[in-house]
Amino acid sequence: MFYLYRKDLSDCYEVDSIFIEIRNYLAGNLAGTTKDDLLVEQMLFLIICKLKDEQDREFEEPVYFQRLYPNNSTLKQRINILFQEIHQKYPTILEAKDEIKIDEKSLEFVVSKLEKLSIISKKETILRVLFERFMGSKLRGDKGQFFTPAPIIKLLLGLIDSNNNTKILDPACGTGDILINAFLNGYYSIWGLEKDRFLAKIAQLYLVLLGSNNKRIFEGNALSTYHSWSDQLKTNIGFNSFDLILVNPPFGAKIPINDKEILQQFQLGFKWQKDPDTGDWQKIALREFQAPQILFIERCLEFLKSGGKMVIILPEGVLSNPSDKYIIQFILKSSTILAIISCPQTAFLPYTFVKTNILILEKSPPPVNYSFFMGIIESIKHYNNEYISDITKVINNYQIYLKNDGTLTDSSKFGFVLTINDLKNLILIPEYYNPVIINQLKEINQKKFELIRFGDLVKAKIIKVNRGHEIGVKSYGTGDIPFIRTSDIFNWEINLNPIKKVSEEIWNKYKYKQDIQAGDILFVNDGTFLIGRCALITPCDTKILIQSHIRKFRVMIDSEFLNKYLLFWALNTEICQNQIKSKIFIQATISTLGNRIDEVLLPIPKDPDVKKNLIEQTKKILLKKAQLKSDFAKLLTI
């Protein structure tokens, strides 16, 4: 009979598909265990049994975790022996009630799918894949907890400038992915805090099985008051005691902290108001609630020793929202910014579409006008160890920056240097300062164009800007008049047969407020991947209404300096579209340009003949498109 030996195990199997198959089987066949937490717990117990089995067997020795050794009837007994050995070795982690509850038929199925796989070779990713496939976005998404994707963990560890003796804490460690990878990369002084008992147990158990000698993952809420901590927590997780914080804190509007006792511990637990004279933000009163990621910024600084560093993942809105400037002021006054890395909006898919940034701080008095590193990652790849080169380029540039005492010879979106005095309106978004766009503007300015600020044209009343309206869902489908939304603007024109249409009565209510005229330019101001799209209103397009995410630009008087066609051309140039892209801020999952269209520099030709030619060509194209559209509509009329 053929038995599996330790040497026969392979890492060539696709763990992702194996777990999907197991999940589907157990969900339909495992009696008495339907909750995802219980399914994951049973799978976790089997995974650690297999890991221990591989660790305990010699290369030429048969493994216990197989169906046929010595025969199928002893399978459950062998698995229980492995589990009891783990139970006895780690009685403070596993509880008395913990046991293998899976029935023999289901156990045989699971073992049949895993027996040839080498868990040791997959130790960096096995837990993450297990949770992704068994619980997916439901893991703790309702509590603001999302898996830290493997590429982002790679980035976090690549940004560490530490030695192996560095004392590291993750105060919201979840299943321990960040700490597990830190441990496997040679950082052995690792500590974790997790308020969810189930997740804390998983992280601790997996770490000790990987070789971590000490129980350093503790159940507890990092944000709770110090006096409410257990003696064990006070002994092991103290303030001013860590060299490095690595954390992906829970975030989201659905999980606010509203406990007054917790809030009053933090400066950021209070409301702040901007002093109109000094421009500084002043603390005024306790907030009713605060997002957890905000409080984690302050708590992590408290955990750090003087000179310690924090690498924290934050939603982009924290670093850009006008109402959150008091947070930026707090950061600037209580720490030194070392680096800010922008991650793509797809980084945490499929769990959340929230755009994030990585902020690296040092707990130290900030120097005067110091410099710091910025980098932009536009794309990453999941479920593969060979990540798209954006991450590698940013890591390499940051390491060069550190070795060169805070300087870079070459600047690119993958690495550039900013000073505190370079900041505008306390905006900490790397895209906003993209050096590629700044260089493009310098090159254009030296050519045959002058750069005119859009906002200056509005102030001079050369351009008038209005916005659309939200008419309410009850108005949809009440008539035949197009209600134009952001998705209805494409290819320089509008879709006059949109999904949403309204009645004559609704149109009459808004027609004078919106005042849509031929020659107006519609501009998408909000909406993921749509911002910057433009359409020129033709005489056939005027009987419409536009939603509030669309702006209407009108050149008040066509002149030799500017007319509607030249403005339309300028807005659609690559340099304008790049500027617009760099000024988009993402609040949670909503992209918006806000009033930053005013900051966009329009390229206006200096040569009258060049300007005239651009106007004529743009006009010709737009009129031809309008004529073709009209002709096609007539063709369809029977």
Which residue stretches match the model-derived regions?
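Flexible, glycine-/basic-rich loop-and-beta segments that form/coincide
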Residues: F2-R6, P350-E450
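Conserved Class I SAM-dependent methyltransferase catalytic core
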Residues: W281-L361
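Non-catalytic DNA-recognition/assembly elements of restriction-modification systems
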Residues: Y401-H469, I604-I638
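Low-complexity, Lys/Gly-biased intrinsically disordered segments
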Residues: N248, N445-W492, I590
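Conserved S-adenosyl-L-methionine
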Residues: D142-V247, G252-L263, L314-G317, I327-I328, ...
